[in-house]
Amino acid sequence: MLFSVASLPLSETPLAADVQFAEPSPSATILPGIGRNDDRQPVNPADFPWRALGRVQTALGSRCTGFMVGPRTAITAAHCLFRERTRLIIQPRLIHFLLATSRGAAAGVALVADFTIAPGYDPFHESESAGADWAVLTLSAPLVREGEYLRLDRTLPPRGTPALLGGYSKDHIEIIEADLHCLITEQIRDARGGVLLHHTCHATSGTSGAPLLFRLGSGEWRVAGVQIGSVVDHAGGIAVPAAAIPTSAIGR
């Protein structure tokens, strides 16, 4: 999904006032969320944290990014589970999760057995319910072992937190590309009061569902948020805070 940001809203400013879903100009040559300078670089899918990422792929041809939070549990953006034109839900049996896939080879592949979409997410009113744009996937088989998945952080990261974000972009769908040097800049709100994180990470279409990552002082990687959209015409994007996803939804 795409956002148009006229001016970055402050923490208590409703999302609908300044940040709206928008379509890019047909003549635009700048990728949404990238801008004129592309800071993305390929990363090794065998390295952590990237080996916990995967491509969420439907039989209808749509693709997003997701990440493992348990042996057979993954998270992605809720809008990835709806048909783009009709907004009808896509059945789990039509969705695959390809773990750490790169140039046609994946570390593991599983069907989605079931999924849970966040209460309050409305595919017909995406911008108003953007703070609920997350979903938990239950896979048909375990793809990772204990300790090989990512953990959600339960706090809201402060402004200026160093971050990184990688995923399967539409312009390079066979590899993980990541911006390794970006920042979480603001906490904003959608029209229904849902909290969102604005960041400066270079990421475009296809990365929806990717983890917005930061590192604890101990060196442990944590998920600060779930990427849900890119900013039109320049670098940056919007993520749902990981803290918005209840522990009960992922079973831990």
Language-model region placement:
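Chymotrypsin/trypsin-fold serine protease catalytic domain
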Residues: 131, 139-202
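Conserved catalytic-core segment of clan PA serine endopeptidases
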Residues: 28-48, 62, 82, 87-144
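C-terminal cap/linker of serine protease catalytic domains
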Residues: 145-148, 170-171, 224-252
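Extracellular/periplasmic catalytic domains that process cell-envelope and extracellular macromolecules
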Residues: 46-49, 68-69, 88-91, 127-131, ...
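Short conserved beta-strand and strand-loop elements enriched in small hydrophobics
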Residues: 54-56, 93-103, 162-166
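Catalytic nucleophile loop of clan PA
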Residues: 202-227
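Cytochrome P450 catalytic-core helices
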Residues: 72, 76
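Protease-domain processing segments flanking chymotrypsin-fold serine proteases, especially trypsin-like
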Residues: 3-68, 177, 242-249
